[in-house]
Amino acid sequence: MTLNIEKRADGDSTTIRLIGRMQAEHLEELEKQIRESGPALILDLNEVTLVDVEIVRFLGACEARGATLLNCSPYIRDWIGKEQD
């Protein structure tokens, strides 16, 4: 399964809905979508089914820069915390 990306802008905020498996091969496209977004970024992870360590580190870095991780599953949240330790 591939990753589907749906993007919605609403004023100054942009929500990027991620659907499917997120792997390192998707980082370039994700970074491009984020660069083209407004200052308030929301990453909706509700339909993410699988991540790898590079994605976990990427999500942690996004959050550290002010992005909101919406609907982040507990296992991804825990993994982000472990990578930041």
Regions found by a protein language model. Give the residues of each.
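Short beta-strand/loop segment at the start of cytosolic alpha/beta domains
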Residues: 1-14
